[in-house]
C-alpha cells in the first residue's frame, strides 16, 4: 500500500540516531515516507539532513542529571514539547510512530498514544529504558535488541538492534584476517561525543609501548576534544604515527579494516561490533542514572567476544600491556565469537512490524 508515513523519534547521540536511520532506509526502500522528530542540538542535526529526511525539532533536552535549575528548565520545555509533538503528528499524519529510545520519545510517544497512532518502541539495551517504561501503556509493541529483562513483557518482541546494512555486509572475520601482517590496526571510538577517559589514556599507553609493538592507531576524539587529544599525542612524540578523526564518517570501512576496536559499550556499538565480527576492548560508561553499558560489556566478555575493562581499572600501563600481548590469532577467535552473537536483519524485522501495524 503506497503513501504510508513513519515518524521516527530519535535525538542526542548516534546510539539512538544511527539505528533509526537504518530502519528509515529500509522503510523508504518499501515506498514509505519518513519524517524525523528530534531536537535543536543533538547529533540528528548532523546525521539526518544529508539523507533528505525532513527533520522537525523540539525545544527539549531532557531533565535527568541536570541539577535543580536544569531540571526545572527541562520540565518547562517538556510541557511545550507535548504541544509541539501533537502539532507535528497532526501535520504529518504518520501511520506509525517509531521511538528509538531516549528523552525525545517521551512527549512524542505520549501524544502518539493519545492520538491513537500505532507506537513502536525500540529498546536497544537488555534492561528496560526509563523512557520506554513510562511509554509502555501507550505502545503497541516494544522491540528489543537483546533477550534480556526488557523482553519479558507481553508487548515485547526480540528483533535484535537495527544495524546499517553496510556493516552487516562486511566479509566474515576469517576472510578479512587472511593474509594480514605487520602492526595491528586499532580503532579507538569514543562515540559521537568522544570519551574523555579514552582520549586521556590512549596517548599515554601508546607512549609506553616500544616502537616495534606499537599498533597502527586511528583515534576518533569527538569534535570538541580534537585539539586536546592532538596536543597529547604531539607531546608524546607520536602525532605523525596516529590518525586522528573528530568523527567517523565511514564506520563500515573502518570496522572492516581494523584488527581491534577500543570503545564504550553502548548497545548499538556492541550490536555493530557483533554484526561486523570485530574484537573489542570495552570500557563501559557507568553513571548514576544507568549501568546498561556495564551489562553489555559483561555479556560480550562472557561470550568470549571482547575484553571488558572497567573504567576504574583503566590505566596507561595496563592498556599498554594488554595491547603488547595481542596477536591476530587471538583477535580472530574473538572476532568469530562476536560474529556468532549477531542478529542480522533487525532493521527489516522492525520495518515488517511497522507495516503490520499500518495494516499492510
Swiss-Prot record:
**Where do the annotations place UDP-N-acetyl-alpha-D-glucosamine binding?**
13-15, 164, 192, 293
CDD domains in UniProt: GT28_MurG (cd03785)
| TM stretches of this protein | none
Where does this protein act, in terms of pathway? Cell wall biogenesis; peptidoglycan biosynthesis
Which reactions are catalysed by this chain?
di-trans,octa-cis-undecaprenyl diphospho-N-acetyl-alpha-D-muramoyl-L-alanyl-D-glutamyl-meso-2,6-diaminopimeloyl-D-alanyl-D-alanine + UDP-N-acetyl-alpha-D-glucosamine = di-trans,octa-cis-undecaprenyl diphospho-[N-acetyl-alpha-D-glucosaminyl-(1->4)]-N-acetyl-alpha-D-muramoyl-L-alanyl-D-glutamyl-meso-2,6-diaminopimeloyl-D-alanyl-D-alanine + UDP + H(+)
Under Gene Ontology molecular function, one entry of this record is: undecaprenyldiphospho-muramoylpentapeptide beta-N-acetylglucosaminyltransferase activity
Q: Which family does it belong to?
A: Belongs to the glycosyltransferase 28 family. MurG subfamily.
Record protein name field: UDP-N-acetylglucosamine--N-acetylmuramyl-(pentapeptide) pyrophosphoryl-undecaprenol N-acetylglucosamine transferase
Q: What is the species of this protein?
A: Chromobacterium violaceum (strain ATCC 12472 / DSM 30191 / JCM 1249 / CCUG 213 / NBRC 12614 / NCIMB 9131 / NCTC 9757 / MK)
